[in-house]
Design a protein with these regions (language model features):
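Flexible, solvent-exposed loop/hinge segments and secondary-structure transition points
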Residues: 69-76, 97-99
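Short, surface-exposed coil-to-beta transition loops
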Residues: 28-30, 88-93, 115-120
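A generic structural micro-feature
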Residues: 23-25, 72, 85-87, 112-116, ...
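Short beta-strand segments that buttress and anchor functional surface loops
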Residues: 77-85, 105-111
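Beta-strand/loop substructures that line and gate deep hydrophobic ligand-binding cavities in soluble
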Residues: 96-97, 103-164, 169-171
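Extracytoplasmic/secreted envelope proteins and their assembly/folding machinery
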Residues: 39, 46-52, 92, 121, ...
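Hydrophobic ligand-binding cavity/cleft-lining segments
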Residues: 3-73
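Short, highly charged C-terminal tails/helix-capping segments
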Residues: 66-67, 170-175
């Protein structure tokens, strides 16, 4: 009886591991909001890391988080590094491309609570009196993330933060 239960458990574990291994190697999380403001109003809030505390949902994860700004004041070459509690972790982001009022691209490197290297794009598209702002993050998904993804939806977790950040950008830009 014990050996039958053990075999069944091993088969279930093997099936879960095999299923996790077949999941996509890369991920993309994207959210979009329409803001009643021109791109010229929204763009500086994204392109200048010193303004991120006014809208980024990640700024509230740890009120004692240590932040370091270096490189350019804004735009390409601007760097933001942080180190905080278990929720905020430790990492660094750098603006690698900045096209006035239309695109900000970041290289995002996490050190803690896990290592990850992602790319982030903020795309601003004007349409009449409105601007469509898209926040997208792309990266590779190591096996452990594939396995965890069987039990939690990372798109929902990360997407929720993006939605809060975009709502904050909307509030600031429409004021």
């Amino acid at each position: 009886m014990f050996s039958t239960i053990l075999i069944i458990l091993l088969v279930i574990i093997a099936a879960v591991l095999i299923h996790a291994a077949t999941r996509p190697n890369d991920f993309v999380t994207t959210r979009t909001a329409t803001i009643k403001a021109p791109p010229e109003v929204i763009f500086p809030l994204i392109n200048d890391f010193s303004r991120w505390p006014t809208w980024s949902p990640y700024e509230k994860l740890d009120p004692n988080m240590k932040r370091t700004l270096s490189g350019a004041q804004s735009g390409k070459g601007a760097v933001y590094a942080w180190e905080g509690n278990g929720k905020a972790g430790k990492g660094r982001m750098e603006i690698v491309n900045s096209v006035a009022s239309s695109l900000v691209s970041l290289k995002l490197d996490f050190e803690k609570p896990f290592r990850a290297n992602n790319s982030v794009d903020f795309t601003l598209t004007p349409s009449g009196d409105d601007t469509s702002v898209t926040w997208a993050m792309r990266g590779s998904r190591p096996f452990i993330a594939k396995l965890m993804g069987l039990f939690m939806n990372f798109d929902t977790l990360i997407g929720r933060d993006f939605e809060v950040g975009l709502a904050n950008l909307k509030r600031l830009s429409e004021a």
